[in-house]
Amino acid sequence: SPNCTTVKALKGKKIRSFGADLPKMHNAIGAVPVTVSPTEVYEALQRGTIDYSFLNAGNVESLRLYEPGKYSCGTAMTIAGHMIVIGKKTWAKLPKDIQEIFMDQAAKSQKEYLDWLVTGTKTSIDNIKKAGGVFKEFPASELAKWKAATPDLLKGWADTMKKRGYGSQAAEVATAWRAWTK
């Protein structure tokens, strides 16, 4: 549907969702979250199981989602959660110089990845348009309305972690995350 640039227009629309938090974001504006894996989105758009895919431009391009769903509306968000996890005991066994290499390379990789998200998104949008797709930006004013309607997901996560006995660690992560995303 071409009418996807307002929160009001998304009300009642079936939007591809996943996990515990994204459905809360969709419910907050009256949309209907539908769990669909990325590899099933093409067919879900084709059959009308979903109205919108809620995937980044790179995935829209690589999965050719502009074929069953000509209109791409966004970007409302990008998920950037790629990481390498090392257990505390293993980390403690590594020599300090190796730990420093890991930390240095992690910082470099993070910056390169975030820079790539910007350039990669632009390239994908250009390619979607060349293939006949239409990319419509979701206005900042509408995104602000969506954010205002959405519950504080980070607080919800921290509260859940506190119930599991990790309150101080969760508070530290939440504080760092809020500072990083300002």
Regions found by a protein language model. Give the residues of each.
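N-terminal secretory/targeting leader peptides
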Residues: S1-K182
